[in-house]
UniProtKB/Swiss-Prot annotation:
GO biological process terms on file: axonemal dynein complex assembly; cilium-dependent cell motility
Region of interest (Disordered), ranges: 208-235, 371-390, 607-636, 644-663, 781-806, 819-871
Alphabetical UniProt keywords: Cytoplasm, Phosphoprotein
Originating species: Drosophila mojavensis (Fruit fly)
Subcellular location: Cytoplasm
Keyword NADP attributed: no
GO cellular component terms, A-Z: cytoplasm
Superkingdom as given in the UniProt entry: Eukaryota
Record protein name field: Protein kintoun
Length: 885
């Protein structure tokens, strides 16, 4: 194939280079090396550029065209001004606005605007266009050059009138776009300081000849070989229609862009799992490429990205762009990035696609499965019921809802629990839940941990609420729970649920129900997993599914208390100034059993208290109960004297238990029952008289009593002071036992345990055990000889008295062992000091003369013994706790 053939099919006006072979290139290179060839080549160039030779060339071309009946006119463009723009936003182009006298002059005529009705001038501007040519810009890049030639008068008017100049520019742009089928960027027009771009080249204007010569009319012998000559009047010039509507010039150009779907390779998508190819068609990211050839940087460019669109705006003079692109997928606008390529003038935006969660995919699959079932027209009924029965049930529900339309609260959509709960899942009822009511708000606390917030679903109705949620276990396996709360029928029928709020946390789920009116009197509610598994729960305290029997017993107790309280009782209160006591007498009215109902109620309450208290005993209390200690004889004497004063029967008033000490508690503590008054402290002051073991026992250690007795019980059945410390009494009351007086003292010292970071717990345990042993030995050494002698004397005195044998046997055994270990105590029987070393007996030397002081000294010695035993017990308990740690 020759070079001429290849050049014929090549794109001369495009961006393609000249197609030339290596052989042809070598021949041209060798020829240019020859000096004679170069001389001939330069002579040819000079001959072409010579004006005289060009004139001769034009005359010859005119003569040849005239022989064919065509008039030829050469147009020589004269420089005017240059317009710079781009073609399709890609290629830079220049339009030369030139002048030539050959082109007709512009003319005008008066016309009326059809839209506004105003008169004006309608201009007709002739023009001539020269075919485009390729050229290079200042950066040696390829560009296009178009020449549009007007009459010189048109350019003169454009210089004098700005409106005519704009009209001239629009006419030139319209001619180029119409003739060469290109799109020019009119929003970014520039006017460089040039008169003409490139080298001016003449163009030819051809018209049909009207007056042929006689020689031309003679037939030519070879005329039949050529096509017939066109006649002058045969054809008419093509008249382009005038624009009736002026198109608005856009202020901004729309750049070219493309959207690419980016998808990385995930080996999990090539498995045989059912959900392996769910996200195959969804890309990982979207790449938006925008071509901006007129921008050298993005400093003056504004870019906004949302989840579904990309907005670009550039207001730079000469580079005005505006673009809005709608994205096919939802993207994460916070994690995207943009980069501008200065070499290719391209802006590349990468946006990651937001994929659906597994839960949304499961919901989509359920929806598709339900739609497929509806389309098939056949539904499987697992219970074997006919569709007619289901339709009847639906009709009955709808009729029931129509009856409730008269109420102020419209019924919600009828959704059966079977459709609310998924049949392929097993739902559990929360093991523990609380119910609290305040005004018109009911709060349920479901004790379930690690609840997934997105799994919570509610179904609200007028008098019921259905809740389902899932909890993630330790093995990352979900456990599904369901909770249906329903108000009982017949209880406050006007009560409705207005609003539901569900709050999930790490430890529990809080369900808040706002009712339409006050609901503090609501006695109970129904709860379960569904409507077939509902149980009634009373509205008070903490409800546990495992202690339903205890709840029933407490409800029965409350009912019995209500029956007794409904009976009319007669209460008489007498104040005795001599004994400083208040006597309360409770008698039923006539025709009623005076004591049967009260005694039966009292016995029933004691049984419940014992049963309830035995369940709450911890290891420490059980261990203390196992160690039985004998009562000191001094304390037994005082208790016996106090018991003789109250042998007469007295009725009691039973009031409900409260957290603070009430009137009924102190009154019941003074009755002649089997329970003994107890103290509220385990440890006592080192510098005061210590109570005996029987008085120092806390109320919580006694299974048959639930009251604290930190009050004055000085020989009376009732005390008027509940919180104050009793004062010392004299006179007739000096003989009463001081051990029955309870004194409360508090220590400012705070016990704390500190563990070092670099030591082990076992090491600390051994050190603490050694410290406690040393402290115990020091406390045992503090017992004086007088204390031991007094113990022996007390043993000999009370052993021969009227005390029972089982009360003194333990004391005698202890004193006997103590005397064997300390033989020197017999010499100092009169000395009685406290374990701290202070004399608290106030004159122990005169014990034989003062009988009351002697009794006080004996009681102090017994209290010191009991205190030592309590401290030993506490040391054992602390050692046990340290071993557990």
């Amino acid at each position: 194939m020759s070079a001429s053939t290849r050049n014929k099919h090549s794109k001369i006006h495009g961006n393609e280079k000249l197609d030339i072979s290596n052989d042809e290139f070598d021949r041209i290179r060798d020829a240019l090396k020859n000096e004679e060839f170069r001389k001939l080549f330069f002579d040819y160039v000079d001959e072409i550029q010579d004006p005289e030779n060009r004139k001769i060339y034009e005359e010859e071309i005119t003569q040849l065209e005239k022989e064919r009946g065509v008039d030829v006119t050469f147009i020589h463009p004269q420089p005017g001004f240059v317009i710079k723009t781009s073609i399709d936003g890609e290629l830079k182009c220049f339009i030369n606005i030139a002048s030539c006298k050959v082109v007709e002059r512009p003319n005008n005529e008066v016309s009326v605007n059809s839209q506004t009705g105003q008169k004006g001038l309608s201009w007709s501007i002739p023009l001539a266009q020269i075919p485009p040519r390729d050229d290079l810009d200042a950066n040696n890049k390829l560009c296009k050059v178009y020449d549009v030639v007007f009459h010189p008068d048109a350019l003169h008017l454009a210089k004098r009138n700005a409106q005519f100049r704009q009209c001239l520019i629009d006419t030139a742009l319209d001619g180029v776009e119409r003739e060469y089928h290109v799109n020019l960027d009119r929003a970014n027009l520039k006017f460089p300081k040039l008169d003409y771009k490139g080298m001016a080249r003449p163009s030819v204007l051809r018209t049909l000849s009207k007056n042929p010569t006689a020689e031309e009319k003679e037939p030519h012998p070879l005329e039949h070989m050529y096509p017939k000559k066109p006649e002058a009047d045969a054809g008419q010039s093509k008249v382009l229609p005038m624009k009736t509507k002026v198109t608005a010039v856009p202020k901004f150009a729309v750049p070219k862009y493309c959207i690419k779907h980016s998808h990385d390779v995930d080996m999990a998508e090539y498995t045989d799992e059912l959900d392996a190819k769910l996200q195959v068609t969804v890309p990982r990211a979207l790449v938006v490429e925008i071509e901006l050839p007129l921008l050298s940087s993005t400093a003056d460019c504004h870019l906004d990205v949302t989840e579904k669109s990309v907005y670009l705006l550039s207001e730079k003079q000469g580079a005005k762009y505006k673009l809005k692109v709608d994205l096919p997928y939802t993207v994460n606008d916070k994690a995207g990035n943009a980069r501008f390529d200065t070499d290719h003038r391209c802006l590349r935006i990468t946006l990651p696609v937001v994929r659906s969660t597994p839960r949304e995919e499961r919901n989509l699959h359920d929806t598709v499965r339900n739609l497929s079932r509806e389309d098939s027209g056949v539904e499987l009924n697992s219970n074997g019921e006919s569709p007619v029965e289901d339709e009847e049930l639906v009709v009955e529900l709808s009729e029931h809802n129509q009856e409730n339309d008269s109420n102020a609260f419209p019924p919600t959509a009828v959704v059966s629990p079977r459709s609310f709960l998924k049949s392929n899942l097993h739902y559990l009822l929360p093991a523990q839940f609380n119910c609290n009511i305040l005004d018109n708000v009911i709060v349920f606390v479901l004790h379930v941990t690690n609840v997934q917030p997105d799994s919570v679903q509610t179904l609200q109705q007028a008098r019921s609420l259905h809740l389902q949620f899932a909890s993630m276990g330790t093995g990352y396996y979900p456990t599904h729970y369901a909770f249906l709360m329903q108000l009982p029928d017949g209880v406050q029928p006007e009560l409705r649920i207005d609003q539901v709020e569900v709050d999930t946390g790490d430890e529990n789920v809080v369900l808040r129900l706002t009712m339409n009116e006050h609901c503090m009197l609501l006695p109970s509610y129904l709860a379960g997993t569904d409507s077939n598994d509902l149980k009634e729960y009373p509205v008070f305290g903490h409800q546990n599914n495992n202690n339903e029997k205890e709840t029933e017993v407490e409800v029965a107790e409350m009912e019995k208390c209500d029956l007794v309280s409904e009976k009319s009782l007669q209460i008489n209160m007498d104040h005795n100034d001599v004994e400083h006591a208040l006597e309360v007498t409770i008698e039923p009215q006539e025709n009623e059993a005076p004591l049967d109902s009260l005694e039966l109620l009292h016995e029933h309450q004691q049984e419940l208290q014992q049963l309830h208290h035995q369940k709450k005993l911890n290891k420490k209390q059980r261990k203390r109960n196992k160690k039985q200690r004998s009562l000191s004889e001094s304390a037994c004497e005082d208790l016996k004297l106090a018991q003789e004063h109250h042998e007469q029967p007295m009725d009691t008033l039973k009031l409900p238990h409260r957290k603070q000490r009430s009137y009924s508690e102190c009154n019941e503590s003074s009755l002649g029952s089997s329970c003994v008054q107890r103290g509220i402290l385990k440890r006592f002051s080192r510098y005061g008289p210590h109570p005996s073991i029987s008085d120092s026992c806390s109320s919580i250690d006694d299974c048959s009593s639930t009251y604290s007795c930190s009050v004055d019980a000085a020989g009376t059945g009732f005390s008027q002071s509940f919180g104050s410390i009793p004062e010392e009494r004299g006179g007739d009351e000096a003989g009463l036992s001081e051990s029955c007086k309870k004194t409360v003292r508090f220590n400012d010292h705070i016990m704390k345990q500190v563990f070092r970071l670099d030591s082990s717990i076992l090491g600390q345990r051994k050190k603490n055990q050694k410290r406690r042993d040393c402290k115990l030995r020091a406390q045992q050494r503090r017992l004086s000889e007088g204390d031991s002698a007094d113990y022996v004397e007390v043993d000999s005195t009370h052993g021969s008295g009227d005390q029972p044998a089982h009360k003194t046997a333990a004391n005698a055994q202890y004193f006997k062992q103590h005397n064997n270990n300390h033989p020197h105590v017999k010499d100092n029987k009169k000395q009685s000091l406290h374990d701290s070393g202070l004399d608290l007996t106030n004159g122990s030397i005169n014990n034989k003369n003062n009988h009351s002081n002697e009794n006080a000294t004996k009681r102090n010695e017994a209290d010191a013994k009991n205190t030592m035993m309590f401290e030993m017990d506490d040391v054992d308990e602390e050692a046990q706790d340290a071993a557990n740690i």
